[in-house]
Amino acid sequence: MRFLLGLQYFASKKGVGSTKNGRDSESKRLGAKKSDGQFTNAGSIIYRQRGTKIHPGLNVGRGGDDTLFALIAGTVKYEKFGKNRTRVSVIPN
């Protein structure tokens, strides 16, 4: 004679589902690298940005990723122009 036992096994560990959170992109370190009145060398990065938040002025070049850099050595000068735009120039010493 056979006995059928209705055994039920309980989990010894809680089932843990995966989450869709828990990751983020690395910061890009955007923003001003040289402030107003600071000396800069030719080729030095003045402002790292996405888009043209700050526009290039005299003796300032713009890279492919909109980074502004000094074309000559001199003093950095930020100035307002237009209604609400800012440009950065490098004045030779």
UniProtKB/Swiss-Prot annotation:
Top-rank taxon, per record: Bacteria
One GO cellular component term: cytosolic large ribosomal subunit
Keywords: Ribonucleoprotein, Ribosomal protein
A biological process from GO: translation
Propeptide: 1-10
Record PTM: The N-terminus is cleaved by ribosomal processing cysteine protease Prp.
Chain positions covered by the region annotation Disordered: 14-36
GO MF annotation terms: structural constituent of ribosome
Biased composition (Basic and acidic residues): 21-36
Keyword Acetylation: no
Pfam families the UniProt entry points to: Ribosomal_L27
Family under the similarity heading: Belongs to the bacterial ribosomal protein bL27 family.
Annotated protein name in UniProt: Large ribosomal subunit protein bL27
